[in-house]
Amino acid sequence: MNLIAIPALIDNYIWLLHNKKGECLIVDPGDATPVLHILSNYQLKLTSILLTHHHPDHVKGVKLLSQYFPVTIYGPQETFKQCANIIVKKGDFLVLLEKKFAVLSFPGHTLGHIGFYSYPWLFCGDTVFSAGCGRIFEGTTKQMYESFQEVNQLSSHTLICCAHEYTLTNLAFASSLLPKDRIISSYQRHVTILRNKKKPSLPTKLSLERLINPFFRCHDINLHQAINFSPLLGCEWLVFDYLRQKRDNFRGNSSQK
């Protein structure tokens, strides 16, 4: 099984997974054109589309793609009116490309946001970003925090396939909170080199995110001291809320979703 990150729009990635038979699925096609180019270049047959939520930059390419291919389109209830023809929810399982995918619930960015997990790949849309998290448009901070806890229960070897290239800005934010953190600083240099070469920083491994992503470190005393915020035991989501507010006002993030 092979994974391809297809750059689209301004900073989106459309994920494509294909097998040796030339069959493939894609996740969150906000634009059909780059997908059609890849399908042609690799001589692949599109069989399924997975949608994590209803925002246009994740679904706008579905209509055109479905005109070229008789695809099954899986998505949460919030995508039904737009394009999904099979509604899925937490606890459902799909067998696609001879692999089993679990449907997970990730409310926060939108209320009905879902993810698809087939080890080692997690397609999480706009929930987890490398070194960051999605903006909260419909849900609550606590819901997004709980979605992160769902992700954190997965294998440390999980490859997080998020939908946007925000890593450098997120690392700049993380570094502003923890300027002496050598792992964050080192990874920031590494990603800078990748991006200067026009290479993606994704997918990212969950084990790495536990180290560089402040939103996975709400329990971390070092982070509490750095931001001068000490939550009561069991109230780590308040740290998450504080971080999300700080991130919303951080310079250079005007394009982040």
From Swiss-Prot:
Cofactor binding notes: Binds 2 Zn(2+) ions per subunit.
Entry's EC annotation: 3.1.2.6
Binding sites annotated in the UniProt record for Zn(2+) 1: H53, H55, H109, D126
Pfam families listed in its UniProt record: HAGH_C, Lactamase_B
Broad enzyme group: hydrolase
Binding site for Zn(2+) 2: D57, H58, D126, H164
Catalytic activity: an S-(2-hydroxyacyl)glutathione + H2O = a 2-hydroxy carboxylate + glutathione + H(+)
SMART domains, A to Z: Lactamase_B
Necessary cofactors: Zn(2+)
Annotated GO biological process: methylglyoxal catabolic process to D-lactate via S-lactoyl-glutathione
Keywords of this entry: Hydrolase, Metal-binding, Zinc
GO MF annotation: an example: hydroxyacylglutathione hydrolase activity
Protein purpose: Thiolesterase that catalyzes the hydrolysis of S-D-lactoyl-glutathione to form glutathione and D-lactic acid.
PANTHER family in the cross-refs: HYDROXYACYLGLUTATHIONE HYDROLASE (PTHR43705), HYDROXYACYLGLUTATHIONE HYDROLASE GLOB (PTHR43705:SF1)
SUBUNIT field: Monomer.
This protein's name: Hydroxyacylglutathione hydrolase
Species classification: Bacteria, Pseudomonadati, Pseudomonadota, Gammaproteobacteria, Candidatus Palibaumannia
Gene: gloB
